[in-house]
Amino acid sequence: NDTLVSSFENKEDANNIILGKSKMALEFMQGIQLALDSLEKTGVSINLVVYDTRNDSSKVVEILQSRLLDSVDIIIGPIYSKNMKLISDRYGNDKKHTLISPLSKSSEFLKNNSSTIQLNTPYKNQVKIITEFIEEKYNDQNITICYEEPEKGLALYMQKNLSKSQNKISMMNMIYTHIDSIRTQFLDTQIIILPSNNRAFVSKMLGTLGGIDSSFIVFGLSNIKNYDHLDLENLMHLDVHFPDPYYFNSNNSNNSKDKVLLNNFEEKFMAIPSRFSVVAYNIMMNFCTKNQIYEFEKFRLNGGKVNINAPLVKYQDYSLEKVLE
């Protein structure tokens, strides 16, 4: 289900948030509530209104027809792309509104909608982050880009972005991923890149690579973080790197703002914030104050903006840590 949460700031901004009626939604709301407390302490007053859309497109249409959103400045959501498109079709080019997609990986709603923003860094932007890091840190390495045919375009984009480096780039269309069929092909490879959002393919490749007696650095996309069935020790063994637009380490936060968030959340809810709570909190603080948590660039000439603040991370000592640049 989707829930539309409208918040109206008395003085300047107004905000709307669409979230799922689930554990994720409750965690998201906790982040909003914590942000409201923080904003109130700075003199910013916000009234919150919730609309339950039940993840029903007809309910979203009903809300749009009611004109309830006409007077707000910022609309955050929906989570689901089909409903996000309905909202962006109405307000996507309205300069009086800013539309924010908090979690969806789909960028379709950004096209020709200049007032839209995507927080989940698109895969092409993640490719740029990975290739820039490799070009800066590695030279004269053997790099293999492994892909399946449906995602060949993203693999070729990765190859193109690496073409200016001094590394040796190989492309490998993976038809078989059994360890015995590919073991010898990786003996001289130092870096392996998996530019894929296919859960089954990435999982199988990581399992196969973990069984090869060789030393790798593996780069993947942010979706790896969502695959909770992966072996953490294997991820550490393979030194798996990936961009994370939602990075927050509650175990070891050296960022003073993150520490404030963590301490305040624990005091209010007697728990550690989930990533959904952190996302919600950061959205409110970024767009209702002058704190710049995200960094944006244009998606296309006449389109919206995407978040490019997605630091590279890796698992180290059983914890997700930022990669030192």
Q: Model-found features: residue ranges?
A:
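Extracytosolic ligand-binding ectodomains
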Residues: 1-325
